[in-house]
């Protein structure tokens, strides 16, 4: 794939994913609407802004592996109700973040740093979303990926593609706690 995204294919896939967001659960984080799931991945990203698609791509890849995963694109606040119904024990948010690191760098970001120098590439306040998510579970992790570019485009850089694959493998193996902290 090497990060090449086709906007028309993304749109068609998005329709399918929207239909399956609530009903598709499985893998080691199996859940249904009346059962609590262990881990829910919330991917944030804009597929039309190059590397900014990273969080969404991670969510989609993990969904294919059977994880309870939501591709919230750039509107995570719209999925609070869905997340609440899943009753996750832990929420892992994946997003591109400006961290002044080399492109493709992956870091776990302490939630208190979101108010400080850490900025996601979206206009919505991630701190407000996290505050709402804390009402669901206190176990929230933010994984940030340093983008190379967030200019309008449909190509994810090689560095960020590698980071996406690293995060998918790490979460699949249950080793997200081993990611370096910012």
Regions found by a protein language model. Name each.
Residues 2-148, 154-182:
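N-terminal catalytic or cofactor-binding beta/alpha core of small enzyme domains
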């Amino acid at each position: 794939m090497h990060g090449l995204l086709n906007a028309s294919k993304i749109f068609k896939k998005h329709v399918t994913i929207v239909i399956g967001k609530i009903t598709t659960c499985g893998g080691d984080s199996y859940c249904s609407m009346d059962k609590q799931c262990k881990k829910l991945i919330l991917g944030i990203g804009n597929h039309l802004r190059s590397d900014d698609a990273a969080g969404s791509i991670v969510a989609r890849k993990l969904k294919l592996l059977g994880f309870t995963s939501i591709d919230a694109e750039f509107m995570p606040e719209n999925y609070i109700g869905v997340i609440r119904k899943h009753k996750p024990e832990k929420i892992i948010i994946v997003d591109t973040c400006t961290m002044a690191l080399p492109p493709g760098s992956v870091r776990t970001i302490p939630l208190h740093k979101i108010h400080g120098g850490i900025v996601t590439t979206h206009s919505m306040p991630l701190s407000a979303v996290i505050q709402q998510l804390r009402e669901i579970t206190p176990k929230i992790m933010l994984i940030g990926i340093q983008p190379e570019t967030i200019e309008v485009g449909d190509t994810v850089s090689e560095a960020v593609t590698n980071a996406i694959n690293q995060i998918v493998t790490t979460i699949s193996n249950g080793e997200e706690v081993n990611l370096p902290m910012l």
